[in-house]
Design a protein with these regions (language model features):
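N-terminal targeting signals for export/organelle localization
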Residues: 1-60, 219
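N-terminal "domain-start" segment that seeds a small globular fold
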Residues: 43-75, 92, 99
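Short loop/turn microsegments at loop-to-beta-strand junctions
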Residues: 58-59, 81, 179-181
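Short active-site neighborhood of thiol/selenol oxidoreductases, capturing the structured segment around
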Residues: 71-101, 115
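Sec/Tat-exported extracytoplasmic proteins
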Residues: 80, 89, 105-109, 137, ...
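Structural microenvironment flanking redox-active thiols in thiol-disulfide oxidoreductases
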Residues: 98-157
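Structural micro-motif
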Residues: 144, 155, 162-168, 176-183
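Thiol-/selenol-based redox modules, centered on thioredoxin-like
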Residues: 170-219
């Protein structure tokens, strides 16, 4: 008599491809961000050996910051600092400029480099308004100040001090027309570089030169 043995097929569960794709999609931006950060650091290291020119000295000034406290040349004395000119209701480039400025915080976090944003619409940009704007951007509040004050002083500071264009817009609702450049200032108050905040390599060049200054003028 012939005995037949029944065979049992064992199926291995198929991998959940949906989960794998979700994990992959989550990892892609993280890996991309890491690679871009690494590439920026490589560029910074290459550029940071170039000599820096001098463009004149920033005149003494005193304005008011987002906390309604006096802030100016005295508080910046002996520091390397970076300036920009913006206004909080800007319909044009200011959000990009401020975002790019915020990108400087992490790579310069232990350097002591100070960030300073001057409002070119001081009548609307009161300390209270600047504080709300600043809170959305600052990771280290003690290292980034937003300044307001008399229009005449800020206009003169932009045009005569930093050599940056500033004028009234053709349409009142569009606000002032101002420079989109970052300005690098050394410990002596001398301007050492200008950088287009809207250019793809603007932040990279600025970081490189800031690192150069930190070596040239250690604390």
């Amino acid at each position: 008599m012939k005995t037949e043995t029944a065979s049992v097929a064992v199926r291995t569960p198929a991998p959940k491809s949906g989960t794998a794709w979700k994990v992959t999609l989550l990892l892609i931006p993280l890996v991309t961000a890491g690679v871009l950060f690494w590439l920026r650091q490589v560029q910074v290291n290459v550029l940071s050996n170039r000599p820096l020119p001098s463009y004149g000295t920033v005149p003494s000034f005193e304005l008011v910051n987002q906390d309604a406290q006096p802030f100016g040349s005295r508080q910046l004395s002996g520091k390397i600092w970076i300036a920009d000119f913006i206004f909080t209701s800007c319909p044009g480039p200011c959000p990009i400029i401020s975002t790019r400025m915020s990108e400087l915080q992490k790579p310069l976090s232990k350097s002591g480099v100070h960030l300073v944003s001057f409002s070119v619409d001081p009548e609307k940009d009161t300390p209270e308004v600047l504080r709300v704007y600043a809170d959305k951007l600052r990771k280290e509040p003690l290292r980034w100040d937003f300044l307001t004050g008399p229009t005449a002083i800020i206009t003169s500071l932009s045009r005569d001090g930093f050599k940056l264009a500033l004028s009234e817009g053709e349409q009142p609702e569009s606000g002032p027309i101002h420079s989109t450049r970052f300005v690098l200032v050394d410990r002596r108050g001398t301007i050492r570089g200008y950088y287009d905040a809207l250019a793809p390599d603007g932040v990279t060049k600025l970081l490189a030169d800031a690192n150069h200054l930190l070596r040239e003028q250690p604390k």
